[in-house]
Design a protein with these regions (language model features):
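Sec/Tat signal peptide C-region and signal peptidase I cleavage site
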Residues: 20-24
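Catalytic zinc-binding patch centered on the HExxH motif and its immediate surroundings
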Residues: 213-245
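Second-shell loop/turn segments in exported
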Residues: 28-32, 36-37, 50-62, 102-103, ...
Length: 246
């Protein structure tokens, strides 16, 4: 009997340690690059929402408009962190390396990454020179980026200003963050990330409530006009983490 009691205690200890290790693994934090890249994804979805909610003209593929908006919006919202956020998203695009078909609305991922770097560099060439150089942006291409990126930035600043919340206005149209009970959804929804998302969403003077869901789903990030909801799938978070935590 003493032997059996001792054996049970040992087994209980092993199971307790294993459960603790599993819980620690389950709750491990995402890499900063993953959270940075996904913040650009949120900004991109805000761009989609602005186009639809305010009936802005769509003169080129929507994904391109939203990409440019996101880069400028991140720069205006987090000027001290823009380099790390845009660099992380560019690295994620390069890791994806998708080559769309000839008639796709999407550019290839290498081009999308380059566009992010080019556009941010053009907002403040002296500040972002080293970042541009790291990604291979120099010479004539850098000069071209300085020219057209400044114009794109100016255009977006004017549009954003038109739809911005007045400084002293009460925010009423940003809903609570909804988070699925999954490993990657919980890992993304840190207090800091929630604060960043709220800050981005609350900068716009929405006429109806906008919410963000981090959901248990297979897919990427989407904007639903009917539900006025931005959704990020936990499978998308997992993909980013595998690409950017190396």
């Amino acid at each position: 009997m003493p032997f059996l009691i001792k054996l049970v205690k040992i087994m209980f200890f092993i199971l307790t340690v294993s459960a603790g290790q599993a819980l620690a693994h389950e709750q491990r934090e995402l890499s900063p690059k993953t959270k940075d890249a996904l913040l650009h994804v949120v900004a991109h979805s805000i761009g989609n929402a602005m186009l639809r909610e305010f009936d802005l003209p769509i003169l080129v593929p929507e994904v391109d408009i939203a990409d440019d908006f996101a880069t400028v919006f991140i720069y205006l919202s987090f000027p001290e962190r823009a380099r790390s956020i845009i660099s992380a998203r560019a690295r994620q695009h390069l890791a994806d390396g998708k080559e769309p078909s000839m008639f796709s609305e999407y550019r290839n991922d290498r081009h999308r990454a380059g566009r992010l770097i080019c556009l941010l560099y053009g907002q403040d060439p002296s500040r972002f020179k080293s970042m541009a150089s790291y990604f291979g942006l120099k010479g004539r291409e850098a000069r071209v980026c300085r020219d057209f990126s400044a114009e794109i930035g100016r255009s977006w600043r004017r549009i954003i200003k038109t739809y911005s919340m007045p400084p002293d206005a009460r925010v009423t149209e940003v809903g609570n963050l909804m988070v699925a009970d999954t490993r990657y959804a919980r890992a993304l929804a840190t207090t800091e990330f929630q604060q960043d998302v709220y800050f981005l969403l609350s900068r716009i003077d929405w006429h109806s409530q906008i919410t963000l869901n981090i959901d248990d789903c297979n897919g990427a990030a989407t904007w639903s006009r009917n539900g006025r909801r931005i959704t990020i799938c936990d499978s998308y978070i997992e993909r980013f983490e595998k690409q950017l935590s190396k």
